[in-house]
C-alpha cells in the first residue's frame, strides 16, 4: 500500500453501456425524488400542512447540516436556518421570496408572494436551546407576526389569502405552526 495507483478500465462497449444506463437511471430517480419532495414541501407551506413542513425540513436538517454550522453567538443562531430556508424557497421559480423585508412595524424574516396573486406566506423563525421550548417558540413567532403586522406587506399588494407560519429550530430539528390570516 505505497504510492501505487491503479487505473480502472471498462472492459468493453456492452459493459460501458450498462454502466451509462444505470448511472443515468440513478440520477433521474434521485433528481425526480428530490424534486418531488421539494414540491410537496412548497405545497405544504401554501396549505399549512405542518406535518409535511416538519418532515421535509427535519430531513434536510438531519442530512445536510452539522450542529457546528449553527455555532454562533446567541442572537445570530437562527441565521443559518434562515439562510437554508430562503435557499429552499427561492428554488420555486414561481414565487417571489423576500428576506428580512420591512413589513408592518418591523422586519419579517421571510415573505413569500406565491404564484397565486391572491395568496402569500409570512414566515417567522425562532431558535431555541432545548427541544421542549419549540412549541412555545412557534407560538411566539406567530404572535410576533400579528403584533408587528407583518401581513400588511401582502395585504398592501391586495393579497387576501395569507398563511402565517412560525418555525422553531433546535439543533437539527424543527417544529412548525401555521394559521390562516382571518379575512376582514
Where are the regions that the model predicts?
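Domain-level recognition of nuclease-like catalytic cores that cleave nucleotide substrates
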Residues: 153, 157-184
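Extended alpha-helical interface modules used as scaffolds for assembling large macromolecular complexes
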Residues: 1-149, 174-184
Amino acid at each position: 500500500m505505497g504510492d501505487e495507483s491503479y487505473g480502472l478500465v471498462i472492459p468493453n462497449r456492452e459493459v460501458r453501456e450498462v454502466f451509462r444506463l444505470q448511472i443515468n437511471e440513478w440520477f433521474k430517480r434521485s433528481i425526480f425524488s428530490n424534486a418531488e419532495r421539494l414540491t410537496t414541501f412548497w405545497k405544504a407551506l401554501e396549505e399549512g400542512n405542518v406535518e409535511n413542513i416538519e418532515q421535509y425540513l427535519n430531513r434536510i436538517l438531519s442530512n445536510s447540516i452539522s450542529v457546528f454550522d449553527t455555532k454562533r453567538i446567541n442572537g445570530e443562531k437562527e441565521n443559518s436556518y434562515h439562510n437554508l430556508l430562503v435557499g429552499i424557497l427561492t428554488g420555486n421559480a414561481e414565487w417571489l421570496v423576500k428576506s428580512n423585508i420591512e413589513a408592518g412595524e418591523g422586519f419579517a424574516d421571510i415573505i413569500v408572494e406565491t404564484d397565486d396573486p391572491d395568496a402569500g406566506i409570512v414566515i417567522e423563525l425562532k431558535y431555541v436551546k432545548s427541544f421542549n421550548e419549540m412549541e412555545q417558540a412557534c407560538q411566539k413567532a406567530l404572535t410576533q407576526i400579528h403584533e408587528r403586522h407583518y401581513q400588511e406587506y401582502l395585504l398592501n399588494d391586495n393579497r387576501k389569502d395569507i398563511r402565517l407560519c412560525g418555525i422553531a429550530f433546535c439543533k437539527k430539528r424543527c417544529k412548525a405552526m401555521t394559521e390562516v390570516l382571518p379575512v376582514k
